[in-house]
Amino acid sequence: MDKPLALGKIQGNIIGGFNKDYETFLFLNVLDAGKARGYLDEIKNEIATSEEVLAFNRLFKQLRKRHGGELGILKATWTNIAFSAAGLDALKIKDLSKFPKEFTDGMAARKKMIGDLGESDPSNWIGPLGSKQVHAVLIVAADSQSDLYQQVTRYEEALTACGGFSIVFRQEGAVRMDDPGHEHFGFKDGVSQPGIRGVDKPTGEDPDQGNPGQDLLHAGEFVLGYATQTHDEKPGHDGPNPDPGPISENGPAWTENGSYMVFRRLAQDVEGFHNHVKNKAAELGMTPELLGAKLVGRFASGCPLEKMKPESNG
């Protein structure tokens, strides 16, 4: 039996995605540890919890279904914060040796293993992203551009005034307004998320499945301090072993209920992808829609590949 998730101590967007149309990422450098820690103490209650975000998302879905739309029915602006190993060191945090090497080294130092070579070399990354100067990332997500601007402006002014941080890079994000709910290659987004035991409930007869085709996994795969998956197959069971595995403990004891975030800024060649799919599909004697589904793992509509129904695409 898995222990209950302390959702009030887990940051929102770890369990329970923000699911907002607009986001800003503020990349921070620590100038003064004491002042920086003082400011973090001031805003700690502004950091969203998974408990809050999950409750909001459930209510939002209920109201959208009831009203037949989502315009203006319910709004919230969320904040999340993450720290790099260099940032924790700059904040005078102890026990850094207990973190995994992958975290303390950082992506730039592991470029050969990751494949960040040639044009993708960290020396070519925009701004300070390939250096150790990024100490923290403050993520703000909102339903409207105006709500986002208001909150981000407040943080920018406060960060400057506190004297503990400098803002070294800013990344804006927004959903596609021309094709809502779809990523840039045209495929429905957000449909490949695993289910989490203790959060997502079975919707059918199989107790190990959330939504149809969605395996329920132990929370320790995503959050520190909880049971992980066991890699041994369970005789007579189809799918991931439902029995809990070892507790995830990749860090000091105080990291319980925390997680690891990876920020990757990628260039996507949308035209190149579609041209390749079109040409290769002709060689293979299949439609571009089917080949695209085979490459991505689902049709553009989000229809599972197992259905093998190109006409479901759209």
Predicted features along the sequence, with ranges:
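Long, low-complexity, Ser/Thr/Gly/Pro-rich intrinsically disordered segments that act as flexible linkers
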Residues: 1-314
